[in-house]
């Protein structure tokens, strides 16, 4: 199944980054470019369009030339709120979401998720040890359920994904591609990589 003409890539950069001391994680530099740019650059060859979901420093993200989507729900309620805002503000049926702190996304992420979808409205990455529900291919058809879930005060991504009939896709052969950058110490370790 090849959906690359109709999938919009979304870099999720709207979090509070508490473990990063509150710094806007997407704007932290790795190898001379911001973390969000690593993700956008990895997604761009796989998709027709890439947008950014962000809540702070919107002018900096907008300077990239990419469309920037702020959350429609106040107070940084989490990645599901960013996903809902994208559904509300961007046309299309399919969206590939990826957090800004995963700088080594594989070149075949979209094709592998799409090929293993098997009719599900949501599929996400499993690296062989853990789920990565914010690295997910999601159909707009879940928007009503997502709206209701958030209105009920729920925020847990994994529970929502399972409730709407999603499943994980095995990426255990490239587990290292899903190591993310959560703390200043982890960023320092990433800076030492070749």
Curated annotation (Swiss-Prot):
Mg(2+) binds at residue 101. GTP binds at residues 12-14, 25, 71, 101. SUPFAM superfamilies: Nucleotide-diphospho-sugar transferases. Its cofactor is Mg(2+). One of its GO terms (biological process) is bis(molybdopterin guanine dinucleotide)molybdenum biosynthetic process. It comes from the Bacteria. Its EC number is 2.7.7.77. Pfam families: NTP_transf_3. It is found in: Cytoplasm. InterPro entries: MobA-like_NTP_Trfase (IPR025877), Molybde_CF_guanTrfase (IPR013482), Nucleotide-diphossugar_trans (IPR029044). GO terms for cellular component: cytoplasm. Keywords: Cytoplasm, GTP-binding, Magnesium, Metal-binding, Molybdenum cofactor biosynthesis, Nucleotide-binding, Transferase. One of its GO terms (molecular function) is GTP binding. It catalyses: Mo-molybdopterin + GTP + H(+) = Mo-molybdopterin guanine dinucleotide + diphosphate. Belongs to the MobA family. Monomer. Transfers a GMP moiety from GTP to Mo-molybdopterin (Mo-MPT) cofactor (Moco or molybdenum cofactor) to form Mo-molybdopterin guanine dinucleotide (Mo-MGD) cofactor. PANTHER family: MOLYBDENUM COFACTOR GUANYLYLTRANSFERASE. The N-terminal domain determines nucleotide recognition and specific binding, while the C-terminal domain determines the specific binding to the target protein. This is Molybdenum cofactor guanylyltransferase. It comes from Salmonella typhimurium (strain LT2 / SGSC1412 / ATCC 700720). The gene is mobA.
């Amino acid at each position: 199944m090849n959906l690359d003409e109709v999938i919009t890539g979304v870099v999720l950069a709207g979090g509070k980054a508490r473990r990063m001391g509150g710094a806007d994680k997407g704007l932290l530099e790795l190898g001379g470019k911001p973390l969000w740019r690593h993700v956008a650059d990895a997604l761009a060859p796989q998709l027709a369009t890439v947008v950014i979901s962000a809540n702070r420093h919107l002018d900096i993200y907008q300077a990239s030339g990419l469309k920037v989507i702020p959350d429609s729900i106040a107070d940084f309620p989490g990645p599901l709120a960013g996903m809902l805002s994208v559904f509300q503000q961007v046309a299309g049926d399919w969206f590939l979401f990826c957090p800004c702190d995963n700088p080594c996304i594989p070149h075949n992420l979209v094709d592998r998720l799409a090929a293993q979808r098997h009719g599900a409205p949501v599929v996400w990455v499993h690296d062989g040890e853990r789920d990565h529900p914010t690295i997910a291919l999601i159909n707009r058809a879940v928007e009503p359920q997502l709206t209701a879930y958030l209105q009920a005060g729920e925020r847990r991504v994994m529970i929502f994904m399972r409730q709407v009939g999603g499943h994980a896709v095995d990426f255990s052969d490239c587990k290292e591609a899903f190591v993310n950058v959560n703390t200043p110490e982890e960023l320092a370790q990433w800076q030492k990589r070749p």
